[in-house]
Amino acid sequence: MGDKEFMWALKNGDLDAVKEFVAGGVDVNRTLEGGRKPLHYAADCGQDEIVEFLLAKGANINAADKHGITPLLSACYEGHRKCVELFVSKGADKNVKGPDGLNAFESTDNQAIKDLLH
């Protein structure tokens, strides 16, 4: 199985499949198709259980994708409060700026997320 199947599992919250990929040797910090890491895809889609699993397996919490976007920024852009909460609790850098020049706090209009980032 390749990137497409792994990315599908990451985006759709199939934790069992993600665990199988990782147990089979998939690097949790590998750059996938699209120039993004597994953590970015999970964060984009609000898959907090997968985010938590990947972090436990050593995923780089501050990894930037090909556009300079971190997983925390991805979660902020998409309004995924639980993922933002996980990233903040695990020490994600809240000051990294995305390609638009905005940090995590500045990049969201969601008040619940802003409260987590203060």
Curated annotation (Swiss-Prot):
It is found in: Cytoplasm; Nucleus; Cytoplasm, Perinuclear region. It comes from the Eukaryota. ANK repeats lie at residues 1-30, 34-65, 67-98. GO terms for cellular component: BRCA1-A complex; BRCA1-BARD1 complex; cytoplasm; nucleus; perinuclear region of cytoplasm. GO terms for biological process: protein K6-linked ubiquitination; regulation of barbed-end actin filament capping. Keywords: ANK repeat, Cytoplasm, Nucleus, Repeat. One of its GO terms (molecular function) is ubiquitin-protein transferase activity. Belongs to the myotrophin family. Regulates NF-kappa-B transcription factor activity. Promotes growth of cardiomyocytes, but not cardiomyocyte proliferation. Promotes cardiac muscle hypertrophy. Plays a role in the regulation of the growth of actin filaments. Inhibits the activity of the F-actin-capping protein complex. This is Myotrophin. It comes from Xenopus laevis (African clawed frog).
